[in-house]
Amino acid sequence: IISSLAWLGIEHDGDEYIQSKNITKHVAIAEELIKKGFAYECYCSEEEINEQKEKCKKQGMPYVYNRKWRDAKDLEIPKDIKPVIRFKSKISGNTIIKDLVQGERNISNSTIEDFVILRKDKSPTYQLSATVDDHEMNITHVIRGDDHMINSFKQKQIYDAMGWEVPNFAHIPLIHSE
């Protein structure tokens, strides 16, 4: 990456940052989100998830996790399943992003599933690690392809839950061949 940026005339101005070296912080933030009520342990088995996906496919619907464990009080925790940690996405209203390229963008919160932020092995997903690391490095601008717009809506909800300042987002249209 560094050499590719140099080829473009963009000089590297700091230490290289390796995301996997910050896992302890990512896990700590996931645990804090649980304590604040913005995340939860999900004990769905792979079989359950696959059944849900197949059901959605048969109905011609995109898969969205059914939130079974979101507010679980009476469910028995399976002893043979390690949980993933899911972020509690907002259910109502809209999430709004002021994009520097595309202007104000919004999405209905009902279309954002409760996404996984920590896998069963406690490794963070992109949504959590990118958000935490950008915050830790005081990133002010996130510039990426517009295929990542949905990620920005999810990450904005994490920023809001943690009370962190949201960086400026700029989503650039991708170059597509004919």
Give the location of each predicted region.
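A glycine-rich helix N-cap at a beta->alpha junction
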Residues: I2-S20
